Amino acid sequence: MQLENIEILENHSLAPYAYTQAGGLVDYLAIPKSIHELKVLVNWAKELGMPVQVFGRLSNLIVRNGGLRGLSILLHDLRDVVVDQNKIVASAGADLIWVTEQAFEHGLSGLEWGAGIPGSVGGAVFMNAGAYGGQVDMVVSSVTALMPDGTLQNFEKKALEFGYRKSVFQSNGGIIISATFELQPDSCTAIRTRMDENNFKRANKQPLNYPSNGSVFKRPEGYFAGKLIMDSKLQGVRRGGVEVSKKHAGFMVNIAHGTGNDYEDLIHYVQKTVYEKFGVHLETEVRIMGER
């Protein structure tokens, strides 16, 4: 169906768009090409009383087999990136890896930790993503969001309420539109060296040859999730087509047409086993949504 020349897909699978290559059907799916189109879609759903879910590149999401009700919006066509002196303004759907490369090309340091991290700028801000000693809250100075009342609001750093894998957008209903990164000048050679070092670590430690969400669990205080899982002898354990990676225990990989339910079942089994063995509850870093 069409809404002001915006294509809306009905009963459409999210699996082809997801990094896990798993996920159920959504009632309606749309991919806006502008903020105006995003507003039109949100208003349409609101008028019909439909729930709205907004996603970036589905790198940190598990959708159960029963799928999602209402309207699901993917922002990956909102991907403008503008470099202005030591600042980069990136749209929510921009690939974080691409933004990291733009920083390198302009001799701007601070995003090297993002080299090789899949996902969108919006998703990275939403989760306060980070790796190898770097994190979104160390480099983002402001964020623009579309609020539930239909207005665009600018959030300065303090108002973003960043925490470990947390931001204000997990509770205020705002849809992230763009983020401003404030970086530091450095030589391109030094920046590339740090990026290459991080990519080398990833290639050696992570199962990059299979679909996955990356790190499944948050780091529990005083522990490392991957080591707890490894010490629980859970590597190689499967539920359906999803397996605890033999290469990195903190990852779950889709090795044989796994489903969203397979991921969730394996997550619950790992949580239960680790808690019984060590008394530590593993909290998921990935988001699990939808109906069983």
Curated annotation (Swiss-Prot):
It is found in: Cytoplasm. Pathway: Cell wall biogenesis; peptidoglycan biosynthesis. One of its GO terms (biological process) is regulation of cell shape. PROSITE patterns: FAD_PCMH. Disulfide bonds: none annotated. The gene is murB. The active site is at R165, S215, E285. It holds the Pfam family MurB_C. Its EC number is 1.3.1.98. InterPro entries: FAD-bd_PCMH (IPR016166), FAD-bd_PCMH-like_sf (IPR036318), FAD-bd_PCMH_sub1 (IPR016167), FAD-bd_PCMH_sub2 (IPR016169), MurB (IPR003170), MurB_C (IPR011601), MurB_C_sf (IPR036635), Oxid_FAD_bind_N (IPR006094). This is UDP-N-acetylenolpyruvoylglucosamine reductase. It catalyses: UDP-N-acetyl-alpha-D-muramate + NADP(+) = UDP-N-acetyl-3-O-(1-carboxyvinyl)-alpha-D-glucosamine + NADPH + H(+). Keywords: Cell cycle, Cell division, Cell shape, Cell wall biogenesis/degradation, Cytoplasm, FAD, Flavoprotein, NADP, Oxidoreductase, Peptidoglycan synthesis. Belongs to the MurB family. Residues 21-186 form the FAD-binding PCMH-type domain. GO terms for molecular function: FAD binding; UDP-N-acetylmuramate dehydrogenase activity.
